[in-house]
Amino acid sequence: LATSSAASDVYKRQMWLIGVAKEDVTLMGQLLGIKLAASEFIGYIQLSDLKDATNLIHLNYQKSIIIATYMLCGFANFASIGIQIGGIGALEPKQRKNLSKFGFKALIGGTLASLLSATIAGMIIG
């Protein structure tokens, strides 16, 4: 819980930039932090709880739910760096150093791609 709270503080500004309503930026920031630290699967489990309006803590807008769905869709998390180094490195062991060098950049690129898709979906919804 402390990790998701810290992630919320870090990522809530980015959530505002991609078009999330101010009432939902904190929860959306938590979702992005969970996705990056754990995996998109855990993020989707959390999103399923946040979709339920009968819960005390929930997302207030349907647009936020749709943006979250696109934002969580992707393989950009810290575990994926290891998976890519192990998987691709097994095919070409000489390139493991390059893979580890570019792993974090790939994480940032993948996250930005997911956020761009979420932003476009939010723009289309209006």
Label for each model-derived stretch:
Residues 12-49:
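Hydrophobic alpha-helical transmembrane segments of multi-pass integral membrane proteins
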Residues 2, 20-21, 94:
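Short coil/turn linker and secondary-structure boundary residues
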Residues 35-126:
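C-terminal transmembrane helix pair
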Residues 5, 26-30, 68, 101:
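Transmembrane helix-loop boundary segments of multi-pass membrane transporters
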Residues 1-7, 11:
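Single conserved hydrophobic/aromatic residue that forms the stacking wall/gate
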